[in-house]
A protein has these predicted regions:
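Catalytic cores of NTP-dependent nucleotidyl/adenyl transfer enzymes across multiple folds
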Residues: 2, 6, 16-20, 27, ...
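Hydrophobic (often cysteine-bearing) scaffold residues that line and stabilize catalytic clefts
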Residues: 7, 11, 68
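Short N-terminal amphipathic alpha-helix/helix-capping patch enriched in small hydrophobics
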Residues: 11-18, 36
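Generic non-transmembrane alpha-helical segments
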Residues: 18-28, 71, 75-79
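Active-site nucleotide-donor binding segment shared across nucleotidyl transfer reactions
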Residues: 23-55, 59-60
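Short, conserved acidic/polar surface loops in the N-terminal third of protein domains
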Residues: 44-48, 68-71, 107-109, 123-125
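Catalytic micro-motifs at enzyme active sites that drive phosphoryl/nucleotidyl and oxygen chemistry
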Residues: 45-47, 82-86, 96-102
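Metal-dependent nucleotidyltransferase catalytic core
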Residues: 59-93
């Protein structure tokens, strides 16, 4: 994928490594599902047509989030400068680091857990995911949503906010894949 800047390549590798860390952990893999633009681009649209800079997760079951947040902090301990923000319906971990490739710039990673929407319509699936480069090699199965359900959340997002990326994501997915409109 032709990213515009070296730090975007670094951030994309950090996202991939974080996903492997999260979903290689049996506890977290049973508690969290991966969704959002990053899920759509990493799992269903290849090559990635757009840069995505965060990890959106959903708490699978309605239960206290404290132990999940604690474990998430443990498995992401390779990332520096963690700030945790807890709200009623979502919990966020923010990480800040400097890029390794000059010129040095700030890279941030946001990992957000939606603690409100515990349902899914089409059932969760596990999709193999791997990273293989000189910086990090690892693999896991990501717990996520089926393509049509991810597209449904993108369609809903069009009604809730005005961000061109949602329309772009829908366009790319609909032109690259056969989808069932009734499921969306």
């Amino acid at each position: 994928v032709p990213w515009n800047a070296n730090e975007q390549v670094e951030q994309d590798l950090i996202i991939s490594r974080a996903l492997v860390a999260i979903f290689s952990d049996d506890f977290l893999a049973s508690k969290l599902a991966f969704r959002g633009g990053t899920a759509l681009h990493k799992l269903y649209l290849s090559p990635q047509p757009r840069y995505s800079e965060d990890i959106d997760l959903v708490q699978i079951d309605a239960e206290p989030i404290k132990s999940t947040m604690y474990r998430l902090g443990e498995v992401l301990n390779f990332l520096p400068d963690r700030v945790t923000k807890q709200k009623r319906f979502n919990n966020t971990m923010l990480f800040r680091m400097e890029s390794e490739i000059p010129p040095t710039v700030q890279i941030r990673l946001k990992v957000e857990i939606n603690c409100f929407e515990h349902f899914n319509e089409l059932g969760l699936v596990k999709i193999p995911f791997s990273v293989d480069n000189s910086w990090f090699t690892g693999q896991c199965e990501l717990t996520t949503y089926r393509l049509n359900e991810l597209l449904g959340t993108k369609l809903r997002a069009l009604y809730q906010r005005k961000k061109g990326r949602d329309l772009f994501d829908l366009y790319k997915a609909l032109t690259l894949h056969e989808v069932n409109p009734d499921e969306i």
